[in-house]
Protein backbone atom coordinates (compact mmCIF):
# COMPACT_ATOMS: atom_id res chain seq x y z
CA UNK A 1 0.00 0.00 0.00
CA UNK A 2 1.37 3.41 -0.91
CA UNK A 3 1.33 6.30 1.60
CA UNK A 4 -1.45 8.03 -0.38
CA UNK A 5 -3.83 5.06 -0.16
CA UNK A 6 -6.44 5.13 2.62
CA UNK A 7 -7.56 2.19 4.74
CA UNK A 8 -10.70 4.01 5.87
CA UNK A 9 -13.92 2.29 4.75
CA UNK A 10 -15.96 4.05 2.12
CA UNK A 11 -19.29 5.54 3.21
CA UNK A 12 -22.47 3.79 2.05
CA UNK A 13 -24.81 5.26 -0.54
CA UNK A 14 -28.30 4.15 -1.49
CA UNK A 15 -29.52 4.23 -5.09
CA UNK A 16 -33.27 3.75 -5.57
CA UNK A 17 -34.66 2.71 -8.97
CA UNK A 18 -38.29 3.82 -8.67
CA UNK A 19 -40.87 3.29 -11.42
CA UNK A 20 -44.32 1.87 -10.74
CA UNK A 21 -45.86 2.64 -14.18
CA UNK A 22 -49.31 2.31 -12.58
CA UNK A 23 -49.61 -1.26 -13.78
CA UNK A 24 -51.36 -4.06 -11.88
CA UNK A 25 -50.65 -7.54 -13.26
CA UNK A 26 -53.61 -8.91 -15.18
CA UNK A 27 -55.83 -5.85 -14.62
CA UNK A 28 -56.50 -3.49 -17.56
CA UNK A 29 -56.77 0.10 -16.32
CA UNK A 30 -57.52 3.47 -17.95
CA UNK A 31 -54.57 5.80 -18.36
CA UNK A 32 -55.76 8.29 -15.76
CA UNK A 33 -55.96 5.55 -13.14
CA UNK A 34 -52.52 4.22 -14.05
CA UNK A 35 -51.10 7.73 -13.69
CA UNK A 36 -52.73 8.09 -10.28
CA UNK A 37 -51.42 4.71 -9.10
CA UNK A 38 -47.96 5.52 -10.45
CA UNK A 39 -47.76 8.83 -8.58
CA UNK A 40 -49.29 7.52 -5.37
CA UNK A 41 -47.10 4.44 -5.06
CA UNK A 42 -43.90 6.33 -5.85
CA UNK A 43 -44.67 9.06 -3.31
CA UNK A 44 -45.54 6.36 -0.78
CA UNK A 45 -42.16 4.68 -1.32
CA UNK A 46 -40.33 7.97 -0.82
CA UNK A 47 -42.36 8.60 2.34
CA UNK A 48 -41.29 5.20 3.71
CA UNK A 49 -37.63 6.02 3.06
CA UNK A 50 -37.99 9.21 5.11
CA UNK A 51 -40.14 7.56 7.79
CA UNK A 52 -37.64 4.78 8.47
CA UNK A 53 -34.61 7.05 8.29
CA UNK A 54 -32.85 6.10 5.05
CA UNK A 55 -31.70 9.68 4.48
CA UNK A 56 -30.21 9.82 7.98
CA UNK A 57 -28.53 6.44 7.87
CA UNK A 58 -27.02 6.57 4.39
CA UNK A 59 -24.31 9.02 3.45
CA UNK A 60 -26.10 9.68 0.16
CA UNK A 61 -29.50 8.73 -1.28
CA UNK A 62 -30.14 8.98 -5.02
CA UNK A 63 -33.61 8.32 -6.40
CA UNK A 64 -34.01 7.52 -10.10
CA UNK A 65 -37.64 8.07 -11.04
CA UNK A 66 -39.74 9.14 -14.02
CA UNK A 67 -37.47 9.94 -16.99
CA UNK A 68 -34.39 8.95 -14.96
CA UNK A 69 -35.64 5.36 -14.55
CA UNK A 70 -33.66 3.98 -17.50
CA UNK A 71 -30.80 1.57 -18.03
CA UNK A 72 -28.22 4.21 -18.96
CA UNK A 73 -29.18 6.42 -16.01
CA UNK A 74 -29.04 3.47 -13.61
CA UNK A 75 -25.61 2.41 -14.84
CA UNK A 76 -24.30 5.98 -14.71
CA UNK A 77 -25.64 6.49 -11.19
CA UNK A 78 -24.08 3.27 -9.88
CA UNK A 79 -20.71 4.06 -11.44
CA UNK A 80 -20.74 7.67 -10.26
CA UNK A 81 -21.65 6.72 -6.69
CA UNK A 82 -19.00 3.98 -6.66
CA UNK A 83 -16.24 6.56 -7.08
CA UNK A 84 -16.69 7.67 -3.49
CA UNK A 85 -19.14 5.22 -1.88
CA UNK A 86 -20.04 1.58 -1.51
CA UNK A 87 -23.53 1.25 -2.98
CA UNK A 88 -26.73 -0.46 -1.87
CA UNK A 89 -29.47 -0.67 -4.51
CA UNK A 90 -33.23 -0.66 -3.94
CA UNK A 91 -35.34 -1.80 -6.91
CA UNK A 92 -38.93 -0.56 -6.67
CA UNK A 93 -40.09 -1.41 -10.16
CA UNK A 94 -41.83 -4.07 -12.18
CA UNK A 95 -39.85 -6.78 -13.92
CA UNK A 96 -39.82 -9.65 -16.37
CA UNK A 97 -37.34 -12.51 -16.75
CA UNK A 98 -33.90 -10.88 -16.77
CA UNK A 99 -35.35 -7.37 -17.11
CA UNK A 100 -36.38 -4.36 -15.03
CA UNK A 101 -39.22 -2.21 -16.33
CA UNK A 102 -38.27 1.45 -16.48
CA UNK A 103 -39.83 4.77 -17.44
CA UNK A 104 -43.51 4.49 -18.40
CA UNK A 105 -43.07 0.81 -19.14
CA UNK A 106 -41.23 1.62 -22.36
CA UNK A 107 -37.66 1.57 -21.02
CA UNK A 108 -36.33 -1.93 -20.35
CA UNK A 109 -33.22 -2.43 -18.24
CA UNK A 110 -31.78 -5.72 -19.40
CA UNK A 111 -28.90 -7.43 -21.16
CA UNK A 112 -27.45 -4.29 -22.73
CA UNK A 113 -27.15 -2.49 -19.39
CA UNK A 114 -25.84 -5.50 -17.50
CA UNK A 115 -23.31 -6.41 -20.19
CA UNK A 116 -21.89 -2.88 -20.12
CA UNK A 117 -21.61 -2.94 -16.32
CA UNK A 118 -20.06 -6.41 -16.41
CA UNK A 119 -17.34 -5.26 -18.83
CA UNK A 120 -16.47 -2.35 -16.57
CA UNK A 121 -16.48 -4.51 -13.43
CA UNK A 122 -14.35 -7.24 -15.04
CA UNK A 123 -11.78 -4.65 -16.13
CA UNK A 124 -11.70 -2.87 -12.76
CA UNK A 125 -13.87 -4.08 -9.85
CA UNK A 126 -13.21 -0.86 -7.95
CA UNK A 127 -15.27 1.08 -10.50
CA UNK A 128 -18.49 -0.68 -9.49
CA UNK A 129 -18.74 -1.05 -5.73
CA UNK A 130 -22.07 -2.79 -5.02
CA UNK A 131 -22.92 -4.28 -1.63
CA UNK A 132 -26.57 -5.42 -1.36
CA UNK A 133 -29.56 -5.37 -3.71
CA UNK A 134 -33.16 -5.49 -2.50
CA UNK A 135 -35.88 -5.68 -5.13
CA UNK A 136 -39.64 -5.98 -5.35
CA UNK A 137 -39.52 -6.60 -9.10
CA UNK A 138 -41.31 -9.62 -10.50
CA UNK A 139 -38.95 -12.42 -11.53
CA UNK A 140 -36.25 -10.76 -9.46
CA UNK A 141 -34.51 -14.08 -8.88
CA UNK A 142 -33.62 -14.16 -12.58
CA UNK A 143 -31.36 -11.15 -11.94
CA UNK A 144 -30.00 -12.09 -8.52
CA UNK A 145 -26.91 -13.93 -9.79
CA UNK A 146 -26.23 -11.11 -12.23
CA UNK A 147 -25.94 -8.73 -9.29
CA UNK A 148 -23.54 -11.12 -7.56
CA UNK A 149 -21.45 -11.28 -10.74
CA UNK A 150 -21.25 -7.48 -10.55
CA UNK A 151 -19.75 -7.67 -7.07
CA UNK A 152 -22.80 -7.47 -4.81
CA UNK A 153 -22.53 -9.52 -1.63
CA UNK A 154 -26.24 -10.34 -1.33
CA UNK A 155 -29.38 -10.04 -3.43
CA UNK A 156 -32.95 -11.26 -3.33
CA UNK A 157 -35.71 -12.03 -5.78
CA UNK A 158 -39.03 -13.70 -6.42
CA UNK A 159 -39.11 -16.66 -8.78
CA UNK A 160 -42.28 -15.40 -10.45
CA UNK A 161 -44.72 -12.52 -10.24
CA UNK A 162 -44.36 -10.69 -6.92
CA UNK A 163 -47.93 -10.00 -5.85
CA UNK A 164 -47.01 -8.58 -2.45
CA UNK A 165 -45.00 -5.33 -2.67
CA UNK A 166 -46.59 -4.44 0.64
CA UNK A 167 -46.19 -5.07 3.47
CA UNK A 168 -42.91 -6.46 2.09
CA UNK A 169 -41.25 -3.08 1.48
CA UNK A 170 -42.18 -1.43 4.77
CA UNK A 171 -41.18 -4.47 6.86
CA UNK A 172 -37.87 -4.83 5.02
CA UNK A 173 -36.98 -1.15 5.41
CA UNK A 174 -37.95 -1.10 9.07
CA UNK A 175 -35.72 -4.10 9.84
CA UNK A 176 -32.81 -3.28 7.54
CA UNK A 177 -32.55 0.36 8.57
CA UNK A 178 -32.54 -0.49 12.27
CA UNK A 179 -29.56 -2.79 11.75
CA UNK A 180 -30.94 -6.29 11.24
CA UNK A 181 -28.95 -8.61 8.93
CA UNK A 182 -30.01 -8.51 5.30
CA UNK A 183 -31.25 -12.10 5.27
CA UNK A 184 -33.33 -11.52 8.41
CA UNK A 185 -34.89 -8.35 6.99
CA UNK A 186 -35.85 -10.14 3.76
CA UNK A 187 -37.21 -13.17 5.61
CA UNK A 188 -39.29 -11.08 7.99
CA UNK A 189 -40.73 -9.01 5.16
CA UNK A 190 -41.68 -12.16 3.24
CA UNK A 191 -43.26 -13.79 6.30
CA UNK A 192 -45.23 -10.64 7.10
CA UNK A 193 -46.56 -10.50 3.54
CA UNK A 194 -47.51 -14.18 3.63
CA UNK A 195 -49.36 -13.82 6.94
CA UNK A 196 -51.25 -10.73 5.80
CA UNK A 197 -52.29 -12.07 2.42
CA UNK A 198 -53.13 -15.56 3.70
CA UNK A 199 -56.07 -13.94 5.48
CA UNK A 200 -57.51 -13.20 2.03
CA UNK A 201 -56.17 -16.03 -0.12
CA UNK A 202 -57.24 -19.65 0.10
CA UNK A 203 -55.89 -22.29 -2.28
CA UNK A 204 -57.89 -25.26 -1.00
CA UNK A 205 -56.78 -28.85 -0.61
CA UNK A 206 -54.05 -27.90 1.83
CA UNK A 207 -51.97 -26.39 -0.96
CA UNK A 208 -50.21 -23.05 -0.89
CA UNK A 209 -51.89 -20.37 -2.93
CA UNK A 210 -49.99 -19.84 -6.22
CA UNK A 211 -49.51 -16.16 -5.40
CA UNK A 212 -47.67 -17.13 -2.21
CA UNK A 213 -45.39 -19.48 -4.14
CA UNK A 214 -44.77 -16.99 -6.93
CA UNK A 215 -43.96 -14.12 -4.55
CA UNK A 216 -41.64 -16.07 -2.25
CA UNK A 217 -38.36 -14.22 -1.79
CA UNK A 218 -35.07 -16.09 -2.19
CA UNK A 219 -31.80 -14.67 -0.86
CA UNK A 220 -28.52 -15.41 -2.63
CA UNK A 221 -25.08 -14.13 -1.79
CA UNK A 222 -21.55 -14.66 -0.61
CA UNK A 223 -22.13 -13.37 2.94
CA UNK A 224 -24.73 -11.72 5.15
CA UNK A 225 -24.39 -8.04 5.99
CA UNK A 226 -26.06 -5.35 8.05
CA UNK A 227 -26.49 -1.69 7.24
CA UNK A 228 -23.29 -0.92 9.15
CA UNK A 229 -21.16 -3.80 7.85
CA UNK A 230 -18.11 -2.77 5.86
CA UNK A 231 -17.99 -4.58 2.54
CA UNK A 232 -15.50 -7.44 2.53
CA UNK A 233 -13.06 -7.30 -0.35
CA UNK A 234 -10.75 -9.79 -1.96
CA UNK A 235 -7.12 -9.16 -1.18
Give, region by region, the residue ranges found by the protein language model.
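Flexible, glycine-rich phosphate/dinucleotide-binding loops
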Residues: 22-23, 98, 141, 164
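Ordered hydrophobic segments in well-structured contexts
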Residues: 14-15, 60-63, 90, 210-212, ...
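Short, surface-exposed linear patches
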Residues: 36-39, 87, 111-114, 155-159, ...
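A domain-level signal for caspase-like cysteine endopeptidase catalytic cores
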Residues: 2-85
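Short, solvent-exposed loop/turn and secondary-structure capping segments
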Residues: 26-28, 100-104, 146
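Catalytic-core segments of thiol-dependent peptidases
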Residues: 49-142, 231
Amino acid sequence: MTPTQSTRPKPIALVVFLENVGHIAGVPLPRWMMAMIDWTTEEYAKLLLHLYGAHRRYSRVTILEDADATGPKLAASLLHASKTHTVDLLLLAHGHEGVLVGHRGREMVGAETFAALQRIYDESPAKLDLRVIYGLNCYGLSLAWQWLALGAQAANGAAGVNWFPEPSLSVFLRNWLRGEPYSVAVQRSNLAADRWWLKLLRAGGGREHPWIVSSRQVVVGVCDVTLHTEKTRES
